[in-house]
């Protein structure tokens, strides 16, 4: 496994300074992501990427694996956040950005309108050039929230199933759930008329069996999910759920092949993979531009290019 480099470099410094100036949070920092330096720093021909966390740094839920702060009554939303986020990202000149958020069950719409406003402003300020992925909550099963996000004009709708069905209650907050998450993903695909790519993520090493992982992959595909990532759960602090198993690279490779055989459009599977990691960025961007009728090659040429990009993405996690 590749040793992760320490955060640093001009691009890393620029992004961190701008985030502090505009009082923005990132899931990269809050969740203590091991890939922070690599993604923020860019390099090796990759786009520097920071996953912006909307609606503050305090979540109303308390999942057993997550290092983000929790509270029953988080601070009010910052009404300037959508404008600040869109301003910062537009200034960085990125081609692809990931938005995520805390859960805000204290808000009537779960924060859907706030997220949607950010997406619309991003599209406006970049004249539609920017590709936007949003990793969003389940909105407590309210499909109105899902529709609000879809209609904002994003390109990739992401929501994480996190773990297998049997372990949902042990891993996630009691307000989350297997059926609710699958319904959210299915609704996003349906409301968009199939236009959106949908994406989800599974943590391994929580005590799941191989058969349960395969069943989870099948359930995601049955609900129209196009992209899946699989990564190793790492315990953020001693207060959090313990790691049940460190899954081998060979097992991750086997799950990747199984997912491909099930028909996922893109799979990133490896110990250091996280749901917002850049491993899929090249491939997903190519697919989205192809759907737009953009600059990509067609037919066999496009398939060959996408295959090369998948290999590059997998190499980033090796």
Swiss-Prot record:
Residues 42-265 form the Radical SAM core domain. Residues 291-318 are annotated as: Disordered. Gene3D superfamilies: Aldolase class I. The keyword tRNA-binding does not apply. One of its GO terms (molecular function) is lipoate synthase activity. [4Fe-4S] cluster 2 binds at residues 59, 63, 66. It comes from the Eukaryota. Keywords: 4Fe-4S, Iron, Iron-sulfur, Metal-binding, Mitochondrion, S-adenosyl-L-methionine, Transferase, Transit peptide. Belongs to the radical SAM superfamily. Lipoyl synthase family. This is Lipoyl synthase, mitochondrial.
